[in-house]
Amino acid sequence: MSLIECKNINRYFGSGENRVHILKDISLSIEKGDFVAIIGQSGSGKSTLMNILGCLDTAGSGSYRIDGIETAKMQPDELAALRRERFGFIFQRYNLLSSLTARDNVALPAVYMGAGGKERSARADKLLQDLGLASKEGNKPGELSGGQQQRVSIARALMNGGEIIFADEPTGALDTASGKNVMEIIRRLHEAGHTVIMVTHDPDIAANANRVIEIRDGEIISDTSKNPEIPASNVGRIREKASWSFYYDQFVEAFRMSVQAVLAHKMRSLLTMLGIIIGIASVVSVVALGNGSQKKILEDISSIGTNTISIFPGRGFGDRRSGRIKTLTIDDAKIIAKQSYVASATPMTSSGGTLTYRNTDLTASLYGVGEQYFDVRGLKLETGRLFDENDVKEDAQVVVIDQNVKDKLFADSDPLGKTILFRKRPLTVIGVMKKDENAFGNSDVLMLWSPYTTVMHQITGESHTNSITVKIKDNANTQVAEKGLTDLLKARHGTEDFFMNNSDSIRQIVESTTGTMKLLISSIALISLVVGGIGVMNIMLVSVTERTKEIGIRMAIGARRGNILQQFLIEAVLICVIGGLVGVGLSAAVSLVFNHFVTDFPMDISAMSVIGAVACSTGIGIAFGFMPANKAAKLNPIDALAQD
């Protein structure tokens, strides 16, 4: 069985009236160890034939077999495997990647074989040394002469073994001396057992081969052999490794090359990132503002009591009949306090009236409450003491005043121990409350607190309360507790002539409302992210167009479609992730400045918003980078190589 066998190969370019028949029923076979020169004038079809033999192009019709396997039935990645594992290409224009050193250019085919970094470098250095380039390993193509670049190209062709060497006009761009040197290397490769297929238009170059096939106008006009074939030796090559390190090495290499591509166009990369930076900074800042305002509001709610349920007469706030409902009593509060889920229950009654001290009369509100009311509501004492259980039991004529009362009546004196009159009833001041700075407590209303027994028995003369404030135990569910209290009072009153205000419900409403606002504003900020993503896609499409030649080179040396897709996708994600991290940093800087100058509420950047921002930027990189990356992966190798 021949190594290579072609039967009736035809190739056409164009369509319709512009259709050109390039190859016409080409049939040939090539044995292992053969050195074949395909000669012909420009436009004869010789390069097209070599591209088909090297699986860079496909025939329009006919059969092409490698070791008896029909290539027409192979998938793109199977053809890539042939180029990677068995073929080596020597191009007229060298086709080296300008951003890589000689060593990295030579080692590149082994990347797609899964060879480790040390193994790749050692083999590349050995090949360069064998070709007289030991001192040029770190040089880039622009720092090498034409002959040196071609020797690097030859070393690359041998990196994975190069069982079959395809040489396309290998001396076409070289001077005479360099051309002779390259041909000597190719002859040695043939003598070492490599099968060599060379395309040339020069009869003197073709004379180095032991078999010459001449093509004219797409047809073979002669096929002559002058020397017997040399038996093929076992050409060594790196074997593909299907292990986790295989995928890891490929990812690391793709990442490294993506970093090089980003750094190669620093300003363009920065401008591309700008949309992502602004978008991420906007989203993180908006969420931070939402978190800060929500935190401030919830702190204010907590300051007036957490885990509390307030019970009022009537059907709801604004119920005009509530003033006539007198069923909420002290006994209700006592029964409620005995429930297993209740920490405390304090009744409250209130009265408005004239507050008198010496010759000053003021309008104030007096609240009759239990001794636990202050703790439940989170009110703090500034000076003096609060009334206790004994004061409540004894109807003590004591009062705790707020800062407004102190400022109005005792601006220049100590109020403790002083007697004031409320509705002409004497009350002794025993304490002063701190000014309540939360959002719900900034008021000019003059407020006083006395034991509810004192207010009910000595001032209002009523037996019912205006409300009952219930403190729920920390381990109890407030929703369950609310239902239990409702059932209890309905059973006692015989009807539901009351309503409840659950502080946790307020908290949930605030959280829901601020969450909705954050989502709404974030969705607006996300528009800039989408715009940034479109910018990334645009630049990646430009990058694919600019690097089409590079893509063709990588495909020629064995890169799978997945390798090309991965590299360009990593590049897009890298741009977006860097942009995302810079955006988070920018938001953090804005937060520091904001929190320094604004004290009402902070910008609170949470770990989740940072994680979400990075995840979002990664998702944008994948979403908007996939189309350009997929376009690159689907390029035809020969079409990509033809781009300048």
UniProtKB/Swiss-Prot annotation:
Q: Which domain of life is it from?
A: Bacteria
Report the SMART domains cross-referenced here.
AAA
Q: Which Pfam family would be a valid example here?
A: ABC_tran
Question: Major location, coarse class?
Answer: membrane
GO CC list: plasma membrane
Q: Name one GO molecular function term.
A: ATP binding
Q: Where does ATP bind?
A: G40, Q41, S42, G43, S44, G45, K46, S47
Q: Where are the transmembrane segments?
A: 270-290, 524-544, 574-594, 607-627
Q: Please name the Gene3D superfamilies in this protein's record.
A: P-loop containing nucleotide triphosphate hydrolases
Record's bilayer topology term: Multi-pass membrane protein
Its EC number is 7.6.2.-
Root EC class: translocase
Which GO biological-process labels does this protein carry?
Answer: response to antibiotic
Presence of keyword Secreted: no
Q: Which family does it belong to?
A: Belongs to the ABC transporter superfamily. Macrolide exporter (TC 3.A.1.122) family.
Q: How does it assemble?
A: Homodimer.
* Function description: Non-canonical ABC transporter that contains transmembrane domains (TMD), which form a pore in the inner membrane, and an ATP-binding domain (NBD), which is responsible for energy generation. Confers resistance against macrolides.
> Under what name is this protein listed?
Macrolide export ATP-binding/permease protein MacB
Q: Organism source for this protein?
A: Neisseria meningitidis serogroup B (strain ATCC BAA-335 / MC58)
Give the source lineage, highest ranks first.
Bacteria, Pseudomonadati, Pseudomonadota, Betaproteobacteria, Neisseriales
